[in-house]
Amino acid sequence: MASKATLLLAFTLLFATCIARHQQRQQQQNQCQLQNIEALEPIEVIQAEAGVTEIWDAYDQQFQCAWSILFDTGFNLVAFSCLPTSTPLFWPSSREGVILPGCRRTYEYSQEQQFSGEGGRRGGGEGTFRTVIRKLENLKEGDVVAIPTGTAHWLHNDGNTELVVVFLDTQNHENQLDENQRRFFLAGNPQAQAQSQQQQQRQPRQQSPQRQRQRQRQGQGQNAGNIFNGFTPELIAQSFNVDQETAQKLQGQNDQRGHIVNVGQDLQIVRPPQDRRSPRQQQEQATSPRQQQEQQQGRRGGWSNGVEETICSMKFKVNIDNPSQADFVNPQAGSIANLNSFKFPILEHLRLSVERGELRPNAIQSPHWTINAHNLLYVTEGALRVQIVDNQGNSVFDNELREGQVVVIPQNFAVIKRANEQGSRWVSFKTNDNAMIANLAGRVSASAASPLTLWANRYQLSREEAQQLKFSQRETVLFAPSFSRGQGIRASR
């Protein structure tokens, strides 16, 4: 009887789980029935002592479709998140520290230094301390940094900061909480800075009562104090073996600087030497083609020597502006570089990929669609004319995307991009670690692979017109301005 009851309970739980997943899938599908797509801007701006954080609306229908949140940020205090992040950097120079639980010490050194009183151990006195850093990376413009879920990290900008873009995927399999974006701060008092600016925020767009309630629930999990604030000073003091005054400072209740602070010249840490080699030399020294093939086969379930790559030994950064990373280059039109799990293995854990694109003035990227991922397009320089078409052939977006704006391109929606007179650069985040596109025009497009008679019959063209349409565009993905203005056929005569 007990076995029957257990079986019935297991079946009931399985049935309930199936219903819940089916309802969730239906809800997600309904959220992607977009009749109109808009260029999105941040709805919340949080000013800290040394930087600004801009947050997009996680409950916007377009982000719900793509299961994603974007926010910008500008030294970040130590924090960890319940979501994985992928961060392209657009500044000259910076440093990042990542603390990986269970991994060996990467950098360690001892240094004689005077310390006493509130900065030392309980009881005061002078002594030595040891600095331990798990992973420390020199970062430069164009680096993409991947941070696994729940990993404590900090970021220090030792140059002139322009912009940092952070992408969070709220539907990632490692997020076992709800869809609200949460960051757990280990230092500072982010709540104080957010509350002081609450009345100064610009009014968001009109929202339904349901979305307002959702945003209120989301706000309850955001911009709180650091995690030590919830513990009592007595237990903190015992845990760290310090006095209660130091423990209260860890709580940060009187710290009004926010979550991004200015450290001046006081941050002195051991750091790896700067790599003076050229990008080509770095690429050649990194890994041989055979080693790359072996690593990829091992990750994809092929033959292996039994020693798999662990999170401790993985690379956490790669430079997407490196010319050797470019997948498509047209000197007259621009370049596109893609980062997927083959080039950047940690992306397989994050289930994300990144695209960096640049178009010269008036150049065009071939109309295309993304086969297996949603696409979040963020313009970092210039302006980009973007047109998006849904499955019914309706234009759901036809507008100029300016610097700092983002647009969501759902899976399989066709899109075409053209730069303005000054050119444009962008970064795209895709919700698949090996996102693939299919082109509609160009030498390697679906159109070029179709039989000539199919062109003539389906579009009611003469044979000459079909040949011109199929063979006149000899570029692959990026088209120079002469082609984008319809002069390609005339120029070939």
Swiss-Prot record:
Residues 190-229, 269-305 are annotated as: Disordered. Keywords: Disulfide bond, Seed storage protein, Signal, Storage protein. Disulfide bonds join C32-C65, C103-C312. One of its GO terms (molecular function) is nutrient reservoir activity. Residues 1-20 form the signal peptide. Pfam families: Cupin_1. Residues 37-248, 318-467 form the Cupin type-1 domain. Residues 191-221, 280-298 have a biased composition (Low complexity). Hexamer; each subunit is composed of an acidic and a basic chain derived from a single precursor and linked by a disulfide bond. This is a seed storage protein. Belongs to the 11S seed storage protein (globulins) family. This is 11S globulin seed storage protein G3. The gene is HAG3.
